[in-house]
């Protein structure tokens, strides 16, 4: 089931959880979507600023599988 997250800090907390499996990054011309797959929900964060998206990509946990989709 999908859930949308508005706060970057909340998204990072979800990504650091034990049941977080992978992160999908979808880049569009106007925004970047980060989708983290946990056991029950798929959490989505939409960012319109490209620089913030790059910083968030750098701060993802290292053990998490990251998949980029164009």
Swiss-Prot record:
Question: What is a GO molecular function of this protein?
Answer: structural constituent of ribosome
The organism encoding this protein is Lonomia obliqua (Moth)
Similarity field: Belongs to the eukaryotic ribosomal protein eL38 family.
Pfam families attached to this UniProt entry:
Ribosomal_L38e
Q: Which GO terms describe its cellular component?
A: cytosolic large ribosomal subunit
Keyword vocabulary terms for this entry: Ribonucleoprotein, Ribosomal protein
Name of the protein in question: Large ribosomal subunit protein eL38
Q: Per the UniProt entry, what are the Gene Ontology biological process annotations, in alphabetical order?
A: protein-RNA complex assembly; translation
């Amino acid at each position: 089931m999908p859930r949308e997250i508005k706060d970057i800090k909340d998204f990072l907390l979800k990504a650091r959880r034990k049941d977080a499996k992978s992160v999908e990054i979808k880049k569009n011309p106007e925004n970047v979507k980060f989708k983290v797959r946990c056991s029950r929900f798929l959490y989505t964060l939409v960012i319109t600023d490209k620089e913030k998206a790059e910083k968030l990509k750098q701060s993802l946990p290292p053990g998490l599988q990251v998949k980029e989709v164009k």
